[in-house]
């Protein structure tokens, strides 16, 4: 469930959602940090779930705290980031995926981008990260298959290396 930092009503309808998954390493987390800091995203709240591990970090500007599941929005580009920095509690992944799926459907996002690492190594070089971090597009329609990636949200955690080849890099999200 989305918890806003302010009392104003926030609608995600017709915006795109960006989130990441990573089996090992933190190149995807680094990519999200680059996206946020280089594209004027602002923190608008967080995703509350009992399934998420607790974590608190300083914001990049050092002026506020950020939680596991923080939401960031770039209104001009109609992009929203869900930053799952602390991970999901052990044995609660299925429940979390169900909660997240329901939230995404209820929020009426127009597109969903899953950022996943194609490398198991930690990479901190910006140019290398741009080559290793791929974007996967998901549809809420289980019958729609886009670029032979995944059919629906629950399949996001079953991506093979073959499906990762030749996909969009994170920089391509910001080409106009």
For each feature predicted by the language model, list its residue ranges.
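N-terminal catalytic or cofactor-binding beta/alpha core of small enzyme domains
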Residues: 1-111, 117-127
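Catalytic cores of processing enzymes, dominated by hydrolases/peptidases
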Residues: 120-176
């Amino acid at each position: 469930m989305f918890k806003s930092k302010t009392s104003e009503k926030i609608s995600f309808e017709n915006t795109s959602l960006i989130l990441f998954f990573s089996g090992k390493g933190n190149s995807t987390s680094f990519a999200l940090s680059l996206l946020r800091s280089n594209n004027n995203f602002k923190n608008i709240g967080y995703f509350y779930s009992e399934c998420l591990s607790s974590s608190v970090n300083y914001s990049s500007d050092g002026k506020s705290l950020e939680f596991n599941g923080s939401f960031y929005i770039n209104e001009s580009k109609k992009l929203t980031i869900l930053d799952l920095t602390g991970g999901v509690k052990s044995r609660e992944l299925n429940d979390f995926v169900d909660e997240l799926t329901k939230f995404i459907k209820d929020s009426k996002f127009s597109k969903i981008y899953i950022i996943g690492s194609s490398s198991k190594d930690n990479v901190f070089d910006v140019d290398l990260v741009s080559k290793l971090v791929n974007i996967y597009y998901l549809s809420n329609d289980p019958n729609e298959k886009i670029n032979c990636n995944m059919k629906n949200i629950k399949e996001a955690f079953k991506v093979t290396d073959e499906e990762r080849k030749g996909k969009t890099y994170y920089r391509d999200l910001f080409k106009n």
